């Protein structure tokens, strides 16, 4: 047992050491990635954004603001035009999809709910109001009369068991029982 415990401790110590080394490597990799992203961001901004030259006088600053507002207006107009084009193309796509469904005969059907209909109403709906078809499904069935069996007659004669108990309960019921026995 002592040797086994030492071996287990050595294995856990080795695992702990490997985990800490892996965490250190991961931390350095994250730092490198962060610095790389920062440098890429700076490069992109330096390429795409011209450096800002602020002139000394107020009139030059106002002129710069007017130029920037003009650029903003142009960008907004382009954005609006593109949005209109996108809306127009999406509308055309919907129309074409609808035409395609119409040509194929596949319509989007609304969810149907169950309606109880008689056979006559169903035939009238299918054939239209011009055709008068009466479909009485019970007309061709055989008429069967129920024959009373002896058991059923006995059950009917006995009647409700509650009435029998009520009649026998109390003094009058007991009196009748004695009178009927003698």
From Swiss-Prot:
<keyword id="KW-0007">Acetylation</keyword>
<comment type="function">
    <text>Troponin I is the inhibitory subunit of troponin, the thin filament regulatory complex which confers calcium-sensitivity to striated muscle actomyosin ATPase activity.</text>
</comment>
<dbReference type="GO" id="GO:0005634">
    <property type="term" value="C:nucleus"/>
</dbReference>
<dbReference type="InterPro" id="IPR001978">
    <property type="entry name" value="Troponin"/>
</dbReference>
<dbReference type="GO" id="GO:0003779">
    <property type="term" value="F:actin binding"/>
</dbReference>
<dbReference type="GO" id="GO:0045893">
    <property type="term" value="P:positive regulation of DNA-templated transcription"/>
</dbReference>
<feature type="compositionally biased region" description="Basic and acidic residues">
    <location>
        <begin position="29"/>
        <end position="45"/>
    </location>
</feature>
<protein>
    <recommendedName>
        <fullName>Troponin I, fast skeletal muscle</fullName>
    </recommendedName>
</protein>
<keyword id="KW-0009">Actin-binding</keyword>
<feature type="modified residue" description="Phosphothreonine">
    <location>
        <position position="12"/>
    </location>
</feature>
<keyword id="KW-0597">Phosphoprotein</keyword>
<keyword id="KW-0514">Muscle protein</keyword>
<comment type="subunit">
    <text>Binds to actin and tropomyosin.</text>
</comment>
<dbReference type="Pfam" id="PF00992">
    <property type="entry name" value="Troponin"/>
</dbReference>
<dbReference type="GO" id="GO:0003009">
    <property type="term" value="P:skeletal muscle contraction"/>
</dbReference>
<feature type="region of interest" description="Involved in binding TNC">
    <location>
        <begin position="2"/>
        <end position="48"/>
    </location>
</feature>
<feature type="region of interest" description="Disordered">
    <location>
        <begin position="29"/>
        <end position="53"/>
    </location>
</feature>
<comment type="similarity">
    <text>Belongs to the troponin I family.</text>
</comment>
<dbReference type="GO" id="GO:0005861">
    <property type="term" value="C:troponin complex"/>
</dbReference>
<dbReference type="GO" id="GO:0031014">
    <property type="term" value="F:troponin T binding"/>
</dbReference>
<feature type="region of interest" description="Involved in binding TNC and actin">
    <location>
        <begin position="97"/>
        <end position="117"/>
    </location>
</feature>
<dbReference type="InterPro" id="IPR038077">
    <property type="entry name" value="Troponin_sf"/>
</dbReference>
<dbReference type="InterPro" id="IPR050875">
    <property type="entry name" value="Troponin_I"/>
</dbReference>
<feature type="modified residue" description="Phosphoserine">
    <location>
        <position position="118"/>
    </location>
</feature>
<feature type="modified residue" description="N-acetylglycine">
    <location>
        <position position="2"/>
    </location>
</feature>
